Amino acid sequence: MRKIVKGGLYRHFKGMYYYVLDVATHSESGEKFVVYQKLYDNRDMYIRSLAMFVSDVDCEKYPDVEQKERFKLMSGRD
């Protein structure tokens, strides 16, 4: 499983950018969730399961997508 960088800038496979604030743990199930904020429009905050955040794009559903990761960590050169 890919490591999540807190404070990292990520690009969603559809092209929009998000800032990862933290990784949180569900109090009952123990499941990990990524807490992140969109960097456009009203800058809403979201949570998504860690497993889904680090998953690859469904190439059958999105056959023309160029980015294989659902969310890709951006380096300073991207």
State where each predicted segment sits:
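Mixed-charge, low-complexity intrinsically disordered regions
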Residues: 1-78
